Design a protein with these regions (language model features):
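Basic/polar, cationic surfaces and motifs that engage anionic cell-wall
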Residues: 9-37, 130-202
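Soluble periplasmic/extracytoplasmic beta-strand elements of cell-envelope proteins
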Residues: 61, 124-126, 163
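Cell-envelope and extracellular/periplasmic
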Residues: 65-66, 118, 123-132
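Short, small-residue-biased leader/transition segments that mark boundaries at the very start
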Residues: 1-4
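N-terminal catalytic cores of peptidoglycan-degrading enzymes
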Residues: 8-116
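Solvent-exposed, acidic/flexible segments
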Residues: 55, 87, 118, 133-141
């Protein structure tokens, strides 16, 4: 009996160690409500797009770029340049710009180098900001809400699955949402409202 229990314990442990595979909801409706995304995928390389498959997506991680005034494409091109400069390993699945533009750098089924231990099961979004406060302007903010809500729909998530880089590592990122907890709660609330609207018409 002990042996049987022991074997079961081993079996359960092995089952837990096996992560769920990547899946996403697909439908004409989901495609129709997708925000406008400029797909500018990085060249496959070990420094910013290593081609490592993600597991089942269980969260969305919000970052800020920490380079005030830079555009989404500026940040995308920085990630692209790492294949030559080899300065560090860094990237993001999406970058939201100052005009509300959304640039995709890495497919959601591939791991981006953004959120440390959560790279393997999250989608990362870098967000541009105009000044040192890290506060997002209205165009950026609205696109962040729209993108997060759409990703929640796509991966069966809700606003509580949207987290900050800070929540993973303690890093002050995104700065404004770490320093203003009320603004962070408001953002998550806005994502929830948008998600419910998307679900209404599904």
């Amino acid at each position: 009996e002990m042996c049987i229990r022991d074997r079961c314990a081993v079996t359960v442990l092995k089952k837990q160690e096996q992560p769920e595979e990547y899946t996403e909801n697909k439908s004409d409706y989901i495609d129709s409500v997708r925000p406008d995304i400029d797909v500018e995928l990085l060249t496959p390389n070990e420094y910013s797009r290593a081609g490592i498959a993600t597991n089942k997506i269980t969260g969305i991680v919000i970052h800020y770029t920490a380079n005030p005034g830079a555009s989404a494409m500026n940040n995308r091109d920085y990630f692209e340049g790492l294949k030559d400069s080899h300065i560090t390993k860094a990237s993001s699945n999406f970058v939201v710009g100052l005009e509300g533009e959304i640039v995709q750098c890495v497919p959601t089924w591939e791991m981006a180098y953004a959120s440390n231990s959560r790279n393997i099961d999250t989608v990362s979004i870098e967000c541009c900001h105009p000044d040192e406060t890290g506060k997002f302007n209205q165009k950026t903010y609205q696109s962040m809400v729209d993108l997060c809500a759409w990703l929640c729909l796509k991966f069966d998530l809700n606003e509580n699955d949207v987290i900050r880089h800070y929540d993973v590592t303690g890093k002050i990122c995104p700065k404004y949402f770490v320093e203003h907890e009320d603004a962070w709660k408001q953002f998550k609330g806005d994502v929830g409202v948008k998600l419910e609207k998307l679900k209404e018409y599904q």
